[in-house]
Amino acid sequence: DSGFDCSGLVGYVFRTALGIELPRVSREMATKADAELIKDRDELQQGDLVFFGRKGRVNHVGIYVGEGRFVHSPSTGKDVRVDSLVSGYWGGRFMQARRVAM
């Protein structure tokens, strides 16, 4: 397979568009100390990192694009897509968000 996994896509976007280096894996991105923790979905802003998982463990990351939606790579080799943050598969798996200082 070629392409991006979820954290690879997020890292690529932040590195190439903003010159910001992020940790390589989603779990480490979710604990990035210099990124503001956002717990309430209503507080999200475009560009925030959104994290998903189960049983308290982060296993997926995307970038919030507004209007309750986020862009992400479902898995390596799959097309990058935009999905709902509030309904469907991802709605029940949202855990937190982080706002990276730009």
Residue ranges of model-derived segments:
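Catalytic cysteine-centered active-site loop
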Residues: 1-46
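Aromatic- and glycine-rich peptidoglycan recognition patches
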Residues: 36-40, 58, 65-102
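Structural motif
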Residues: 47-48, 68
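Conserved hydrophobic/aromatic beta-strand scaffold that supports enzyme active sites
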Residues: 49, 61-63
